[in-house]
Amino acid sequence: MSSYNVKEMMSKKERLAPGHRMCAGCGATIGVRAVLRALHEEDHAVIANATGCLEVSSFMYPYSAWEDSYIHNAFENAGATLSGVETAYQVLKKRGKLPKDENFKFIAFGGDGGTYDIGFQSLSGAMERSHDMVYVCYDNGAYMNTGIQRPSATPMFADTTTTPTGKESVGKMQNRKDLASI
């Protein structure tokens, strides 16, 4: 079994270019960079990114911080978008339209609102059909780039703009959705 070599990982080429508009120290940026570093140098990546903070901060047409192929899609369809791209890739490879030695990886990024709620149906379908893709949910417990509203990922008793805490409310009354179990 091989061990994780931090120096080796950190020396890999950056696939998320500097100059994006993410906040300094943002967890999404750190997570994206870690996921992309897991790729081999020779891998080609196709990234689908649901509308959200990561998308609006890393891709503002005509500027993009993404070094790999990048698709911006709506909140609800990162799973559907990437499953379609992955299927097209498999068909083209099978028909000999793509070189056999090229390796593509398919990665979707979505926030908790776009994953747990709005995009759950398309993600569920992609997983049920066993598409060869990785879906990364950036979970910060609320719809952060639209005013901190509560998705089903918000923990019980959390204070959001739609579940405020105070004299008349204790915050969100429901348990957080257990997405991994579903």
What are these regions (language model features)?
Residues 162, 167-168:
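Internal, well-ordered alpha/beta segment that forms a basic, Gly-enriched binding/recognition surface
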Residues 171-182:
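A structural motif
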